[in-house]
């Protein structure tokens, strides 16, 4: 089977893993979509109803399809870099300029600065966490995230 190819149906196990309740505190507000790209754009469509500024702060280390969602939605973009341990190097001086922050973990670990996320949230910045690489991490999702997006196929 090729990457990104067809996934045949398989019956679910009788024992539930409670993934949704662990990652989404409000499990009644969940949409199942075709891909991570669709998920991010779906969230952006909701955010754009109130976000007139449309300035995003995204990880410099991200795939083109994720960035494309923001371009398609008409967002201006700032990028944050990472150190050698994949810890984001956020610039606090950008908080007043941005309206949206995308956080994510890599290789199963969320290394972002939760205090920076809290400062953004307090300043009215919408927070989205992409949990594609940390979906099954026992740490769970960031409690300050307004939106959580995941591609379970990856």
Sequence positions of predicted segments:
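Conserved PLP-binding active-site segment in aminotransferase class I/II-type PLP enzymes
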Residues: 1-52, 73
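Amphipathic coiled-coil/heptad-repeat helices and related helical stalk/stem segments
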Residues: 16, 36, 40, 63, ...
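Generic structural signal for beta-strand residues in well-ordered domains
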Residues: 23, 32, 48-49, 70, ...
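Hydrophobic anchor at the start of a short beta-strand
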Residues: 30, 77, 127
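Short, well-ordered alpha-helical microsegments
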Residues: 39-41, 63-67, 110-111, 135-138
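Conserved PLP-anchoring active-site segment centered on the Schiff-base-forming lysine
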Residues: 44-93
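Active-site phosphate-binding strand-loop segment of PLP-dependent enzymes
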Residues: 83-154
């Amino acid at each position: 089977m090729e990457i990104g190819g067809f996934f045949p149906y398989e019956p679910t196990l009788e024992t539930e893993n409670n993934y949704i309740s662990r990652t989404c505190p409000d499990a009644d507000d969940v949409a199942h979509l075709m891909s991570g790209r669709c998920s991010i754009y779906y969230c952006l469509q909701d955010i754009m109803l109130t976000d007139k500024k449309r300035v995003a702060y995204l990880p410099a280390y991200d795939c083109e399809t994720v960035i494309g969602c923001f371009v398609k939605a008409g967002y201006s973009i700032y990028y944050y870099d990472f150190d050698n341990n994949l810890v984001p190097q956020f610039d606090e001086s950008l908080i007043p300029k941005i309206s949206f922050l995308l956080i994510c973990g890599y290789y199963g670990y969320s290394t972002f600065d939760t205090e920076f996320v809290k400062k953004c949230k307090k300043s009215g910045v919408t927070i989205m966490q992409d949990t594609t690489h940390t979906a099954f991490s026992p740490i769970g999702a960031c409690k300050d995230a307004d939106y959580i997006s995941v591609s379970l196929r990856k």
